[in-house]
Amino acid sequence: MDETIYPGIVSCLGLLIYYFTLYQSGMARGKFDVQAPSHEGPEAYQCYVRAHQNTLEHLVLFLPGLWLFAFAVDHIWAAGIGLLWPVGRLLYALGYYKAPEKRTIGLFISMPPIYIFVVGALIAFAMKVFEQL
């Protein structure tokens, strides 16, 4: 079986979580009567917008990190560790929608995979370079 299937599934889950926050941010416009293109509105509306924007900011690091780690280290490990990111981002968004201080647990779950992926891939690639010397 092609091992890229597993990080591929995790990538799709990450994109679905991003789309969920995008959708929720759009729905919040109607809920809080904020007309496009404005992002000004009540604090509750801002929580929806920030959950979406922050997820986008992290997605840019998560997806390439996931795939770099998958190719440099292991596809299965990448997928297993990577599952933490969509779960954490979902908890982050749902918490943020309730109150800003309730986003923390989701952030703490979703951040480590990014660090593990980037640092792990860098170490693995460096080791491969040194093996060739």
Where would I find each of the regions flagged by the language model?
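N-terminal signal-anchor transmembrane alpha helix
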Residues: 2-33
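Core segments of transmembrane alpha-helices
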Residues: 54-66
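Short alpha-helical packing/oligomerization segments
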Residues: 66-87
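Interfacial loop-to-transmembrane junctions
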Residues: 91-116
